[in-house]
Amino acid sequence: MKRLQYTGLNYEEVKQMCGDKILAPYFCLGFSMLSLMTEDGFVSVNEGDYIVQDEKGRLSVE
């Protein structure tokens, strides 16, 4: 299992982990956010959230 915290400044590191399942950052109310494609559809990733990749490569947000 891999865990990576999104800081708002580490998009390239997140992109390496998530590949094409992550969309480029966008800004909302002064905060950086990402959209992540999971098995349940797109999920927002906010600064401070953790992206988790399980042993089968499935992604989720905590």
Where are these regions (language model features)?
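N-terminal non-globular leader segments, chiefly Sec-dependent signal peptides
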Residues: 1-39
